[in-house]
């Protein structure tokens, strides 16, 4: 983790949030319990949020989801600590969450979608295998 920013506009809340992340990550490693910290519900300044994001860094995994707005997901430089950012249709941050888990649920397809996709794939394969008329 890089050091904290020192600038006007920082309230010290970034340190408190990061200590909570460290505690939750340790618990996740021991018990598998998952947790989330909704950053947009905490009285953070813009600089506080930037400080948190910078200090957590970026890891090797990231994804973008385009569904009812855009969502950006990335694992931080700490395995199991993810940042999930949902943007409104105007492109502004609607919610920003730190999730402590193996992978955020937003990355998992819904069971109904998986069943429909399996059926569609089977139909596509049967149609391709059918002799041309």
PLM feature segments, named:
Residues 1-51:
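N-terminal domain-onset segments
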Residues 22-35, 62, 68-69, 86-94, ...:
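Extended alpha-helical surfaces
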Residues 38-40, 44, 61-90:
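Short, structured protein-protein interaction patches enriched in aromatics and acidic/basic residues
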Residues 45, 50, 62, 104-106:
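A generic structural micro-environment signature
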Residues 54-61:
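Short, intrinsically disordered, mixed-charge
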Residues 74-133:
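Helix-rich interaction surfaces within compact, conserved domain-sized segments
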């Amino acid at each position: 983790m890089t050091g904290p920013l020192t600038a006007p506009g920082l309230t010290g809340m970034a340190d408190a949030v990061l200590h909570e992340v460290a505690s939750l990550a340790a618990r996740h490693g021991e018990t598998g319990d998952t947790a989330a910290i909704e950053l947009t519900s905490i009285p953070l300044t813009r600089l506080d949020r930037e400080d948190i994001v910078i200090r957590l860094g970026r890891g090797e995994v990231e994804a973008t989801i385009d569904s009812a707005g855009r969502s950006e997901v990335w694992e931080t430089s700490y395995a199991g600590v993810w940042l999930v950012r949902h943007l409104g249709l105007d492109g502004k941050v609607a919610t920003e969450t730190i999730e402590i888990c193996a992978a955020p649920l937003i990355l998992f397809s819904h069971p109904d979608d998986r069943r429909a996709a399996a059926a569609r794939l089977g139909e596509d394969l049967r149609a391709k295998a059918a002799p041309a008329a």
